[in-house]
A protein has these predicted regions:
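C-terminal amphipathic alpha-helical interaction region
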Residues: 49-58, 72-120, 449-450, 454, ...
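Short acidic, glycine/serine/threonine-rich loops at helix termini
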Residues: 121-126, 149-151, 172-174, 200-206, ...
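Gly-rich Lys/Arg/Thr-decorated short loops/hinges at beta-loop-alpha junctions or inter-strand turns
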Residues: 10-15, 67-75, 104-110, 125-136, ...
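Conserved helix-loop functional segments at active or binding sites
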Residues: 44, 65-72, 89-100, 132-140, ...
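Cofactor-cradling patches in redox/metallo enzymes
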Residues: 126-129, 133, 139-208
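Phosphate/diphosphate-binding loops
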Residues: 167-192, 196-197, 204-205, 212, ...
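Active-site loops and adjacent core secondary-structure elements that bind or stabilize anionic groups
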Residues: 1-56, 61-67, 221-442, 446, ...
Length: 547
């Protein structure tokens, strides 16, 4: 329990029993014969309160305690979602008994993941927290253009607009929405959140674009606190708006203009030639759908799952390890059993090997040898080129350095891969969200994303084995998360391989839509979200680096 112990719960007042239910995420309260379901407790309370008063005074007070416990790191996000689930059930029970009246909610926010971004977990968590703290949430979904967001804010007379996005590109889309609001002289305060955002970008750059308030929310409860001020009609709103209009001067980093100065194309001096280039077991493309899900689960990065996806936050590493051992690893194993038995995850891989050479900052990909030939010829047909950025100082690396230069006369090999666990995971997580099964939604979404990453990890190991370079693999799976193996895999959208549009080239070669059912969106993202693609490089010097 997270509140009063069960030994004393039977002696509590009806108000405290309801708060206990919310804080502890339990839909029945009491011991033995005294145990009562939530609906009975609500009926008892209705003898003293109107439904609206019960929500606003007792139930929301319970949710406030939940927020305080979360802020103090005394409650984990999954437990917060348990509480939100109880709150949702209580409100759903009371709503038919309420007179329809305006003003029964604290205020309205229009929420959206911006144009081009398919990620919705962060936005949906904000929806859960705000809607179960008395706010009306108009959740527009993913990939929302600015005009749709603004139109919805006008239609619903929103107190604020909430913009969410995971990608670096999404931060620019947020700026475009804010510029549109300014151009139209509209006055909706805007709350921004997402993994690629920084406080500096919001409070400095974005506030320069808009005169009516822009706020940075690093989690759902930060968004709640901002909304609570914006939805009031007193000094708190004015004070909060003044804050949102005040540009905060941050120290400016030195800016390099990418368009000026020479483009260096000379191979880095720290990258040597590979004396014996590996030969792949086949040229061209293959599809694999025979990975054992149990084996894939062994390659899940638990730190990424527990800390990033499930958002475990503790006061100390000791507390974290105890929580993982006592609560969260058992939950993980139970969920793995469920998805294995149900067939919800369907691991599938399309990958291939192609002859390749470097030409300055380019990697040239050639057609595969025809007939029985295992060796690409010197007059192989060029299919396409990937162009990579180069570091301007230091080691001056580019991914192209890790391939044999065209001038060497040697033909190298490039690996390409795309992995997915299929569409059903997305369908089921959306169903759980809409059904109010918030905690299971968080758990399943996190597991689905990390299972796709685990599939990428285990398949990269398979490719190293096929290329004959796996002898350098660490025997410890956790070491593989830190590149304790020969070579590297680079995914589009990351610093050394930033151009998302290059996904179209990978798609031209691997044909993932027809082979494994993964499509490319208009902004070059993979759908379903639980998919990832990569360029696979065998060179011993190839590791992650920042350009």
């Amino acid at each position: 329990p997270r509140a009063t112990t069960t030994a004393h719960v039977d002696t509590l007042s009806i108000e405290d029993k309801l708060k206990y239910a919310i804080i502890n995420g339990e839909k029945s309260v009491g011991e033995g014969a005294q145990k009562k379901p939530l609906e009975e407790l609500l009926e008892d309370a209705l003898a003293q309160y109107t439904p609206l008063d019960l929500i606003n005074t007792v139930l929301l007070d319970g949710m406030k305690t939940v927020g305080d416990l979360f802020g103090a790191r005394k409650m984990q996000l999954p437990s917060v979602l348990d509480s939100a689930g109880v709150m949702k059930s209580a409100v759903a029970y009371l709503e038919p008994k309420m007179e329809k009246q305006s003003g029964s909610q604290k205020g309205t926010i229009v929420l959206a993941t911006v144009k081009g971004d398919v990620h919705d977990i962060g936005k949906n968590l904000v929806d859960i927290i705000l809607s179960n703290n008395g706010f009306k949430v108009v959740n527009l979904g993913i990939k929302q253009p600015g005009d749709s967001i603004i139109r919805a804010a006008q239609e619903h007379r929103a107190h604020a607009i909430g913009l969410s996005g995971l990608l670096v590109k999404s931060t620019l889309e947020m700026k475009y929405v804010i510029q549109d609001l300014e151009r139209q002289k509209l006055e909706f305060p805007v709350i921004c959140g997402g993994a690629a955002l920084t406080r500096k970008y919001v409070e400095d750059d974005l506030r320069r674009e808009y005169t009516n308030g822009v706020f940075y929310a690093d989690d759902a409860f930060a968004g709640l606190h901002i909304m609570e001020d914006l939805a009031t009609e007193n000094g708190a709103r004015d004070s909060r708006l003044r804050e949102g209009r005040t540009v905060k001067e941050y120290a400016k980093a030195a800016v390099v203009d990418e368009e000026t100065g020479p483009v260096f194309a000379e191979r880095s001096p720290v990258v040597g030639d590979v004396p014996n280039l590996p030969t792949p077991p086949f040229w061209g493309v293959r599809v694999r759908k025979d990975y054992d899900l149990r084996e894939v689960f062994r390659y899940i990065n638990e730190t990424a799952l527990f800390k990033n996806q499930w958002q475990l936050k503790t006061a100390s590493q000791t507390d974290y390890l105890r929580l993982v051992e006592e609560k969260f690893r058992p939950i993980l194993h139970k969920l793995e059993d469920e998805v294995t038995e149900s067939g919800l995850f369907a691991p599938a891989v399309v990958y291939g090997y192609f002859p390749a050479q470097s030409d300055g900052n380019d990697v040239i990909v050639y057609g595969v040898p025809s007939g029985e030939s295992r060796v690409p010829s010197d007059n192989s047909r060029e299919l396409l080129r990937f162009t990579f950025p180069r570091q301007r100082e230091g080691r001056r690396l580019a991914i192209s350095d890790f391939f044999a230069p065209k001038s060497s006369g040697k033909m190298d090999v490039i690996g390409l891969s795309l992995v997915t666990i299929g569409h059903q995971a997305s369908v089921e997580t959306q169903r759980l969200f809409e059904a109010g099964e918030y905690t299971k939604y968080l758990y399943l979404h996190g597991l689905s994303v990390e299972t796709a990453e685990a599939l990428a990890e285990i398949h990269h190991k398979t490719m190293r084995e096929e290329l004959g370079i796996s002898a350098e693999d660490s025997p410890e799976i956790r070491d593989l998360f830190h590149q304790k193996y020969r070579g590297s895999r680079y995914s589009f959208g990351y610093p050394a391989c930033p151009n998302l549009e290059d996904q179209t080239k990978l798609f031209a070669l691997l044909k993932p839509e027809e082979n494994v059912g993964v499509r490319l969106t208009s902004t070059f993202l993979l759908e379903p979200e639980q998919s990832t693609s990569a360029i696979v490089v065998h060179h011993p010097a190839a590791k992650y680096f920042v350009v």
